[in-house]
Design a protein with these regions (language model features):
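Predominantly a Rossmann-like dinucleotide-binding segment in NAD(P)-dependent oxidoreductases
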Residues: 1-55
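Short, basic/glycine-rich phosphate-binding loops at helix/coil junctions
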Residues: 18-22, 123-125, 142
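A short glycine-threonine-serine/GTX helix/turn-capping micro-motif
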Residues: 26-32, 126-137
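Contiguous beta-strand/loop segments that form the cofactor/metal-binding neighborhood of enzyme cores
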Residues: 33-111, 143-151
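Active-site loop of classical SDR/Rossmann-like NAD(P)-dependent oxidoreductases
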Residues: 106, 130-144, 155-158
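An anion-binding loop in the catalytic cleft
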Residues: 116-117, 127-129, 144-148
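C-terminal helix-rich "cap/oligomerization" subdomain common to oxidoreductases
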Residues: 144-173
């Protein structure tokens, strides 16, 4: 079967980010500058949302818009999803995709773990991650895809513009 539901977390390490020497405008837009690739991945795997209900709370000196995010929705394919992030607490990026027989866990995003139905065990899946270890994870293949001839799998500007509507909903609550 296919995806029956999914969830994702885009918690950022505020204690580290506040120390970074970045322009204030970059930090004020940190969700767009650094967190959206997690959201992109979740919606790439689970499907594009047709409805999102979003909540936000808190705020930080360097990111006053919000520091805690929570929400849920349904995709164009009628798959339910939820998300959360708390930039004031410990956490990490992650995506979990559920099917009728498996829970696929991307935490860290570069690794795949699987939990099978009827088991509480979670096992790492061996994947060819040589390029991710040699270069920044995902960068080599993304660059290769960018320069490939013919149809590639990168999103178009029009698709990115549509994705930005989802990012705005998540950010604005």
């Amino acid at each position: 079967g296919g995806v029956t539901s999914f969830n994702f977390e885009f918690t950022e390490w505020s204690h580290e980010i506040k120390k970074l020497e970045k322009a204030p405008m970059v930090k004020e837009n940190w969700f767009l500058a650094n967190s959206t690739h997690v959201v992109d991945l979740a919606f790439y795997i689970g499907g594009n949302p047709k409805k999102i209900t979003a909540f936000r709370a808190g705020g930080l000196d360097w990111h006053p818009k919000a520091s805690i995010f929570s929400g849920a929705g349904i995709t164009e394919g009628d798959t339910l999803f939820s998300y959360q992030a708390n930039w004031e607490a410990p956490g990490r990026w992650g995506v979990e995709v559920l099917t009728k027989k498996h829970r696929l866990i991307f935490r860290p995003l570069e690794k795949l773990q699987v939990q099978k139905i009827g088991s509480i065990n979670i096992e790492f899946v061996d994947i060819d991650d040589k390029l991710d270890n040699e270069f920044k994870p995902g960068l080599y293949r993304q660059t290769d895809e960018f320069f490939s001839v013919g149809k590639n799998r990168l999103c178009t500007i029009a698709e990115h513009l549509e994705n930005t509507k989802h990012f705005t909903k998540i950010l604005s609550g």
